[in-house]
Amino acid sequence: MMFATELLVGGLLAASTVLGAALTRVEYPNNATSKAQMWVYVPDKAVANPPIIVVIHSCQSSAESYSRNSKIPWKQGSDKKGYITVWPSAPNSCWDVSSPRSLKNGGGGDSQAISNMIVHALDKYKGDPARVFVTGGSSGGMMSNVLAATYPYLISAVSLYSGVPAGCFVSSSGGVAQWNNSCSGGSSRATPEAWGNVVRAMYPGYAGARPRMQVWHGSADGTLAPQNYQETIKQWTNVFGYPQTAVSSVKNFPERNYQTDNYGDHLQGIYATGVGHSVPSNLTASEQWFGL
Ligand SMILES: *[C@@H]1O[C@H](CO)[C@@H](O)[C@H](O)[C@H]1NC(C)=O
Ligand SMILES: *[C@@H]1O[C@H](CO)[C@@H](O)[C@H](O)[C@H]1NC(C)=O
Ligand SMILES: *[C@@H]1O[C@H](CO)[C@@H](O)[C@H](O)[C@H]1NC(C)=O
């Protein structure tokens, strides 16, 4: 008998060690038309009033597969620092960054679904509303820009990798989750003011705080032309009223052949010479940008 009990206890302990924290699908109050799924990773040692980090996947991916990608180290960061990561999963193969639903505050698209996930995460995990952060690569980088434009009041800072300006993938026919060759190829160019107007039009009349933006791009990006880096910088410099030239630059930082350009406390660009699509996430540098 005793032997059997010991075996049972030992088995339970082993099972709980093996199970531990895991990416889990969570239902959330969602008033958007988009039925994007919400997945969450709560580390075993979550801190009180945890920061919430939204990690947005690329095309032909999902919350589950992105969270297993070795170049996307946010689960490990969560284990180490105790913040919670929210992993939205797109209803289409890419995020909808082309239709009016998604390109507008309250439009009902994927961006609104993700905003609902942020609200729910803050409520369910008693998250810190002053420490909500967004990151993503490629299509997730595009969505990061769109979220910053459509739901600025929910987000403190963004660190986005290899995306395009907010609104650059707009579909002339209003299509959902459409690819846009003009933008991806780097031919969608506009003045800083025109790009800034695109952001302002996504939430007309908004005059509150906006997230601090960190923009990464590789010079050898063959999927989303490097010109999209310059266009994104033009966009946010205009929104923040910064000059077009960086106020300070650091060569070979945070890595060799990367250059960091600071435009003001709300905008930093990091251009990776020789790096293709998509620039791997640098957990340390993104966490630093988030103040974690
Ligand atoms: C959707 O829900 C959010 C809160 O999660 C709320 O702020 C917003 O007003 C709602 N929108 C509509 C159209 O009901
Ligand atoms: C692609 O996006 C640009 C803006 O970046 C827009 O002017 C153009 O109409 C879009 N193309 C299509 C086919 O929707
Ligand atoms: C990431 O950035 C930090 C500085 O924030 C730097 O020290 C580190 O070398 C970078 N990581 C990699 C893998 O290059």
Language-model segments: residues:
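Active-site nucleophile loop of the alpha/beta-hydrolase fold
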Residues: S159-C168
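The conserved beta1-alpha1 loop
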Residues: P51-S58, S162, H217, T273
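Cap/lid segment of the alpha/beta-hydrolase catalytic domain
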Residues: W87-G109, S171-S172, V176-W179
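Short beta-strand immediately N-terminal to the catalytic nucleophile in serine-hydrolase-like folds
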Residues: V134-G136, Y161, W216
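A domain-start/cap signature at the N-terminus of enzymes
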Residues: M2-I52, Y83-I84, A130, T135-S139, ...
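Gly/Ser-rich "nucleophile elbow"/oxyanion-hole loop immediately N-terminal to the catalytic nucleophile
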Residues: D44-N49, V97-S139, A149-I155
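Short substrate-entry loop that stabilizes the transition state in hydrolases
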Residues: A46-W95, C168, A225, V279
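Short beta-strand/loop motif that positions the catalytic acidic residue
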Residues: V215-H217, D221
